């Protein structure tokens, strides 16, 4: 057995072992409901027995956020900025019903939005591909990663109802009249009632989006496609196209060529058609609305939101946050509270840990940690692919709804733990 094998083969069931030392802290963001239950089990079964790691813990449960007036979320984001890597459990974004359920002081904002606003960066969603699990788009053999520019556009737009006939104008007033001219743009002459909307974006945000996208393409060694409708929105979408091209030519072209990958702009309608026809294996950089829609299409096309990871990457590539792309699995949590059996898919939550640890290992130049993260992913996938052990959602995706076809939440994690020990032991 190699030195790496001896270092990796550590479990609470063994009398003697040497854990892998994680050089720098990792920020752990705990969450809500069923995912919180799973999160704790993953940490105790699959992480802490193998790693000597300083976890900077932040409880982002909705009760904790309410008790701290959401300061805990801001503190967690600042900690990620300080240490470089955060690993996040799924959290509740309260609506009116949740405010009443938890007796909250107010309807707190999405923790993900708060963290993203503090860190900046781009959210990328990547499917976890298991050949055994049927895909609604059978041709998709390799992951399709969706990068969503979650800033501005329709999501920060000002919209209004037009009550009747009149003229609509768009007015720009420069803060410093010596640097730019005021502009008044005629939008439409209404003959009757209607609707109107004005939206925006910034060069700074688009440029950051470009850097995050190019860096991920280099890291993953995948082709990158920016998709817009610049033939219609010649200035608005054209600005995205121009900034991406400028950033690519100035800073990334030579590296792309060295790796044998390429960058290309394509019209969104053409790209979506090509995506369906393709075998996968590329990154799509999309504007806010397009990214919102396409990420869910890709998730369903690959089989399940339970097999989708989400990472936040900053433009400088030095700050990274990983989490599962799904929610807190409330329905299963209600069953858990009643003491009933649950069969909750923990794969995306396991991958939140593995992707964060992999990034920590890369930043700290710790090959053993990177190796462990990869083995953890392999063990998780092989539990399903080779051992045929899966949770109910995956069994149903395979067309089998018999009780014997799936295991409980706890049994699946036990199976992954067993497979992890087996794969570590097999390292020569």
UniProtKB/Swiss-Prot annotation:
PANTHER family recorded: ISOCITRATE DEHYDROGENASE [NADP], MITOCHONDRIAL (PTHR11822:SF21), NADP-SPECIFIC ISOCITRATE DEHYDROGENASE (PTHR11822)
Induction (free text): By growth with glucose as a carbon source.
Catalytic activity of the protein: D-threo-isocitrate + NADP(+) = 2-oxoglutarate + CO2 + NADPH
Chief subcellular location: mitochondrion
Annotated residues for binding of substrate: 93, 110-116, 125, 148
Gene name in the database record: IDP1
A cellular component annotation (GO) from this entry: mitochondrial nucleoid
Signal peptide (residue range): none
Sequence similarity: Belongs to the isocitrate and isopropylmalate dehydrogenases family.
Name this protein carries in UniProt: Isocitrate dehydrogenase [NADP], mitochondrial
InterPro entries per the UniProt record, alphabetical: IsoCit/isopropylmalate_DH_CS, Isocitrate_DH_NADP, IsoPropMal-DH-like_dom
Cofactor note: Binds 1 Mg(2+) or Mn(2+) ion per subunit.
Keyword NADP: yes
Organism: Saccharomyces cerevisiae (strain ATCC 204508 / S288c)
Residues annotated as transit peptide in the record: 1-16
Gene Ontology MF, one: isocitrate dehydrogenase (NADP+) activity
């Amino acid at each position: 057995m190699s030195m790496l094998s001896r270092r990796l083969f550590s479990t609470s069931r063994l009398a003697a072992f040497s854990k892998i030392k994680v050089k720098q802290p990792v920020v752990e963001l705990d969450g809500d409901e069923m995912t919180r239950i799973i999160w704790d089990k993953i940490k105790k079964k699959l992480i802490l027995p193998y790693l000597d790691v300083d976890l900077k813990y932040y409880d982002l449960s909705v009760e904790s956020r309410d008790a701290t007036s959401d300061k805990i979320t801001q503190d967690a984001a600042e900690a990620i900025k300080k240490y470089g890597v955060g690993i996040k459990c799924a959290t509740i974004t309260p609506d009116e019903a949740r405010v009443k359920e938890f007796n909250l002081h107010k309807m707190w904002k999405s923790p993900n939005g708060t963290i993203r606003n503090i860190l900046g960066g781009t959210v990328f969603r990547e499917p976890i591909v298991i050949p055994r699990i049927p895909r609604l788009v059978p041709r998709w053999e390799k992951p399709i990663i969706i990068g969503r520019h979650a800033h501005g556009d329709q999501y920060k737009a000002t919209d209004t109802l037009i009550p009747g006939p009149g003229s609509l104008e768009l007015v720009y007033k420069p803060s410093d009249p010596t640097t730019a001219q005021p502009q008044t743009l005629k939008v439409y002459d209404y003959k009757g009632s209607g609707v109107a909307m004005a939206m925006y974006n910034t060069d700074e945000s688009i440029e950051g989006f470009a850097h995050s996208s190019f860096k991920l393409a280099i890291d993953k060694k995948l082709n990158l496609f920016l998709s817009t409708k610049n033939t219609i929105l010649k200035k608005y979408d054209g600005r995205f196209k121009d900034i991406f091209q400028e950033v690519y030519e100035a800073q990334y072209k030579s590296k792309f060529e060295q790796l044998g990958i390429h960058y290309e702009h394509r019209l969104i309608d053409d790209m979506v058609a090509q995506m369906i026809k393709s075998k996968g294996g590329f990154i799509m950089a999309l504007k806010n609305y397009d990214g919102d829609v396409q990420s869910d299409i890709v998730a369903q096309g690959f089989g399940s939101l339970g097999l989708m990871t989400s990472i936040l990457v900053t433009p400088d590539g030095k700050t990274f946050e990983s989490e599962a792309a799904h929610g807190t699995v409330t329905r299963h949590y209600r069953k858990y509270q009643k003491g009933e059996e649950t069969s909750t898919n923990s794969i995306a939550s396991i991958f939140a840990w593995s992707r964060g640890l992999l990034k920590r290992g890369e930043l700290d130049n710790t090959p053993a940690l990177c190796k462990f993260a990869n083995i953890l992913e392999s063990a998780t996938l092989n539990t399903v692919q080779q051992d045929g052990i899966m949770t109910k959602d995956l069994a149903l995706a395979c067309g089998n709804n018999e009780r014997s076809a799936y295991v409980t939440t706890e049994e699946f994690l036990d199976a992954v733990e067993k497979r992890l020990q087996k794969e570590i032991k097999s390292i020569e």
